[in-house]
Amino acid sequence: MKQEEAVRAAAALGSPFGGRFFLYDLSAEAPDFSEDVPILLMNPKGLYFGPAVSAARSVRDAETPVGVSFGNGDTFVTTLEAVGEYDELLGAGAVVVIGCSNTRFLEDEDGDVCGIVSGE
């Protein structure tokens, strides 16, 4: 799934998640979209574990979906488990993960899409 496709797929999840998405790009090469697609996008380029953990923590009280994408194969599950908030955030439908490659949808126990994972 290409980056733009992943972003648009996540944007489509905005209503079920009940939250807003914000554009946030950590790389110098921000994607250029012809339409305004508000989404939280963390580019794998230059993204390390520390900033990802900080981003995961930042949504705890903000009720804002957070995207965490890694270039080394890690996923948001590892990140959120590290800060002890996986169940809380996933239960609140507050996590969406966007990536440029190796992107797949994440389903909960009921088979409902609850996020997008980028990783190997």
Predicted features by range, described:
Residues 1-38:
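Class I SAM-dependent methyltransferase SAM-binding "motif I" and its flanking Rossmann-like core
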Residues 33-120:
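A contiguous loop/helix-start segment that scaffolds small-molecule binding in enzyme catalytic cores
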